[in-house]
Amino acid sequence: MENIIWQCLLYLSLLTALAWPLGKYIGKVMDGEPFWLQRALAPCERALYRLMGVDPAEQMGWKCYMACVIAFSAVSLVALTALLMAQHLLPLNPRNVSGASWHLALNTAISFVTNTNWQSYAGESTMSYLSQMAGLTVQNFVSAAVGIAVLFALIRGVRASGGIGLGNFWADATRAVLYILLPLSLVMSLLLIEQGVPQNFTDYRAAALLEPLAAEDGAPITHQLVPMGPQASQVSPKQLGTNGGGFNGVNSAHPHENPTPASNMLEMLALLLIPAALCFTFGAKIGDMRQGVAIFAAMFILLTSAVSFTVQAELNATPQIAQGGQVLVAPQSGLQGQAGGNMEGKETRFGIAGSALWASATTAVSNGSVNAMHDSFTPLGGMIPMVLMQLGEVIFGGVGSGLYGMLAFVLLTVFLAGLMVGRTPEYLGKKIEPFEMKMAVVVCLTTPVVILAGGGLMCLAPQIVDSLNNPLPHGFSEILYAATSAGANNGSAFAGLNANTPFLNVLLGVLMLAGRFAPIAAILAMADGLAGKKICPPGAGTLSTCNGLFIFLLIFVILLVGALSFFPALALGPLAEHLQMTR
């Protein structure tokens, strides 16, 4: 237990120490302030603007900014869909994989364009090297850049005083890729290669098995194909950009994507690094670092609580595994200095602590990569990752999207506090009026509406229910998790159901699109409304939004919205399964 505590403390300490300076750096980058890297890459930036025909100084209103987001995403979606369907005709396909079906290609394109990275396929057997590099890896960069760009449009709206314009989308996205995502990914890729992650273009290699197996038909299996390919260059942006789509089907549980405890710690740090840093970026850009620290503190408290709960649930394991009433495995606990606990679906090189910490981190942010199989967690251990997504992916959340989602909850909290004391709500010197509240409510309720509607439709589809590998509460949990992952733009999965069908690929694609672009539209409209307001000096009755009381209120509102929205569904799934297990 002591080792687990030290491992978690080391991770959280490193995260905080790295996030602070990175947050200040990101703020300088996105506002075009001079800095050391700009001297080297400024010619490249200017060349990109000339190529696109863009004036980076041109200001956009929210409608123009949103139109650019939609146009860029639409072109990306069409291009990626075409690439996946035609990959069998293109080079860099040493395994001669066939083109993806229209519904799988569409689902995958939507998934990567929306920063969800839901995967209804196993990458090593379905995608060519060209598709992995020119298609999926490129989207790992640009989809994350879209989130950062939208966040900065909101920041400019908050700090403006009667001004117009939210910045330039093309300049914001270019700077996010060129100065933030590319340099960090390059450094991380080199570190991963040093740890043993492959980066090559060779064909898969056949390795002789130490213990040959027999197939179902009795044929001997003496060799195994070992996937090769450009894996390190995809793993780094998948983690840093909160994307999560792995080169291999089992993601970072695969020893090639995540071979050592050191690579595991590095990839976990990359999960949360930019979302955590953006909290400090926000504080620096509005001129009050206390605001960013308060938001970081609220996120940090929720994350550490989730990690503690998940670790405890997995250490306690299942009380019994029985067949015909006879206990086959005695209860175990990981607290007695042994491996113990629920090790099903986990890599022994990571253990319970590394697996539970990753599961909490990957669902707190909208990453979705895994180093263990969430479907094999205990009912309560698997419920926590689900709840973290259902809260709206605002506990650090996606790159950019997590913080702008959290700011919507901040406005909701300020509004509720204003109602209690009978004052017009204010945030950072700006009065929060009905229009801003309507947009904040759209952001806060999009995730619950999309998830519950999608999950309900899936439960009504006989082909989905019939495809479940597990019955009763756990089967329902698998359906709810799939809808949650798509609607919250996370991408992780419980598995257990056949996702690669036309119905599910299309339905989950619709959920991903709604979960991504409805909040973006509301955030940009809110930013435009805030930009037109004058900043008023704080008065004696102004609610402080950077003290412990406000942090508590913010956490309470986040949990209240999540609990009211999803408790009935959770009661039918993981909670019912836990009661069945312990009765």
UniProtKB/Swiss-Prot annotation:
GO cellular component labels: plasma membrane
What Pfam families does the record tag this protein with? Answer: KdpA
What topology does it adopt in the membrane? Multi-pass membrane protein
InterPro entries, per the entry: KdpA
Q: Name one GO molecular function term.
A: P-type potassium transmembrane transporter activity
NCBIfam families in the record, alphabetically? kdpA (TIGR00680)
What are the subcellular locations of this protein? Cell inner membrane
Secretion signal, residue range per the UniProt entry:
none
Source organism: Desulfovibrio desulfuricans (strain ATCC 27774 / DSM 6949 / MB)
Q: Which UniProt keywords apply?
A: Cell inner membrane, Cell membrane, Ion transport, Membrane, Potassium, Potassium transport, Transmembrane, Transmembrane helix, Transport
By what name is this protein known? Potassium-transporting ATPase potassium-binding subunit
> Quaternary state and partners of this protein?
The system is composed of three essential subunits: KdpA, KdpB and KdpC.
Q: What's this chain's function? A: Part of the high-affinity ATP-driven potassium transport (or Kdp) system, which catalyzes the hydrolysis of ATP coupled with the electrogenic transport of potassium into the cytoplasm. This subunit binds the periplasmic potassium ions and delivers the ions to the membrane domain of KdpB through an intramembrane tunnel.
Which chain regions cross the lipid bilayer? 3-23, 66-86, 135-155, 177-197, 266-286, 293-313, 402-422, 440-460, 506-526, 549-569
Give the family per the record.
Belongs to the KdpA family.
